[in-house]
Amino acid sequence: MEIQTKTLGTQTVEAHQIITLERGLYGFEKYHRFALFDAVQVPFIHMQSLDDPALSFIAIDPFLFRPDYELDIDDVLLQPLDISSPTDVLVFALVTIPPDGSAVTANLQGPLIVNKKNRKAMQVAMGGDRWRTKHDIVAEMAERRAQEQC
């Protein structure tokens, strides 16, 4: 299937790359279908709305820069995804790339949870103060590398 994107032009995606968010994302509730594919810069993922070619997001696997990341989500909240095993789950954090060149951040407080078997997804808001909506990806990756070298 070919889709139009605002920044990357025409892209070809397969059915397994499409996710459905029944409730949409926070602030974007009317957009339900997105295609996931590699972004220009690795390790980022491009998340393109299939409902509006002008709407897209960048996401990242949070475990790449925060291996200690833990999801504190009530199983009842995840029931609409029909998850039968933890191995069926993909987790993404939405990324903010400010136009002024300031820190690229990831939202670890509102992860995107995807059932990779049925491609159902939802964004979940986690309470508590351990995870924030703006984690500096570059700084945290550098900190992780420094810890690994010790």
UniProtKB/Swiss-Prot annotation:
It comes from the Bacteria. It is found in: Cytoplasm. Transmembrane segments: none annotated. One of its GO terms (cellular component) is cytoplasm. The keyword Chaperone applies. Gene3D superfamilies: BH3618-like. One of its GO terms (biological process) is regulation of translation. It holds the Pfam family FliW. Belongs to the FliW family. Acts as an anti-CsrA protein, binds CsrA and prevents it from repressing translation of its target genes, one of which is flagellin. Binds to flagellin and participates in the assembly of the flagellum. Binds to the C-terminal region of flagellin, which is implicated in polymerization, and participates in the assembly of the flagellum. Interacts with translational regulator CsrA. Interacts with flagellins FlaB1, FlaB2 and FlaB3. This is Flagellar assembly factor FliW. The gene is fliW.
